[in-house]
Amino acid sequence: MTTQLTHLQQLEAESIHIIREVVAEFDNPVMLYSIGKDSAVMLHLARKAFYPAPPPFPLLHVDTTWKFREMIQFRGRMAKESGMELLVHVNEDGVKRGVSPFTHGSALYTDVMKTEGLKQALDHYKFDAAFGGARRDEEKSRAKERIFSFRSANHRWDPKNQRPELWSLYNTRIKPGESIRVFPLSNWTELDIWQYIHLEQIPIVPLYYAAVRPVVERDGMLIMVDDDRLELKPGEKVEQKSVRFRTLGCYPLTGAVESEADTLPEIIQEMLLTRTSERQGRLIDHDQAGSMEKKKQEGYF
C-alpha cells in the first residue's frame, strides 16, 4: 500500500534531502542561526536529518549587539539543547566606530554590522557552504534566488549568474574562496512554517506570542523599548500595548503588531486573515529602492 505524504511531510523530506546533500558535498558547512522562527524550523530539520547524532556542523550567529534580550537568552538555550557548537561573531570594528541604527541609519548599520560581520565570520572560519532560513515567499529578490545560491570569492550574489536546479539535482562545484548559500526552506510559506511549528511543537522565542509590552510609535511602526539605549524623540511616549512580532531582527528596526494571539492556533488564524507581508515590519527592507536585492549582491543573507 502506497502512503501519500502530506504537504508538510513533502516539504520536510525536501529540506532534509537538501541538508544531507550539503554535508555530503562540502568540506566545511555552517548553519546561520538568526534565532527567528525560520531558524527554529531549519535547526529542527537539521537535528532530524542526523538523529540520533547531532548535526555535523556548527551554528553561526552574527551578533549586531542590538538583538532583543529574549532572543539572546533563547539562543543559548537552543545551542545547549541541540548539542551543537555555537559560534558568535561581532564586527568589532563597527562596535569601535559606534555604528548603531540610531546614529548611522538602517542601511549603513545593516551593511557594517550584518553583511560585513557575516563575511568576516565566513572568511575567518573558511566555510564553503552556509545554510540560511530565507523563503521565496518572503520578498521578491528571494523569490528568484536558487536553493543553492552561488557566491563569488567576495561573497557577492549575481542574480543573472545562477545555476539550473532540475529534478532536485544541485551543482555544488566551487573554486577555492567561492562558497554556496543554501536555503532548505525556499519552498515553504509563512503558513507552512507556523503549521509545522505547531505540529512538531518546536520552541520559538516568546516575542512571537502576544503580551503587554512597552512600545513607542515611530514612523508608523511600533518599536519595543527593549533597553535604555532607545532614546525617545520629541513628542514620543512609551505605551503599554498587547503586541507580538511576525518577524524578528534588531529591536530598533523591527516593528511589532497589535495582537491578542498568544497561542499557536491563534497566531495561525491571525496570519490567515492578515493582508500584509510578515516583513512589513522590517525597516531594512524599505530603506532604499530594491533594498534587499542590493544587500544580497553585497553579501547579505
UniProtKB/Swiss-Prot annotation:
Keyword Transferase part of the UniProt annotation: yes
Superkingdom in the source lineage: Bacteria
Gene name in the database record: cysD
Family membership: Belongs to the PAPS reductase family. CysD subfamily.
Gene Ontology MF annotations: ATP binding; sulfate adenylyltransferase (ATP) activity
Keyword Disulfide bond: no
Enzyme class: transferase
EC number: 2.7.7.4
The reaction(s) this protein catalyses: sulfate + ATP + H(+) = adenosine 5'-phosphosulfate + diphosphate
Subunit composition and interactions: Heterodimer composed of CysD, the smaller subunit, and CysN.
Protein name as catalogued: Sulfate adenylyltransferase subunit 2
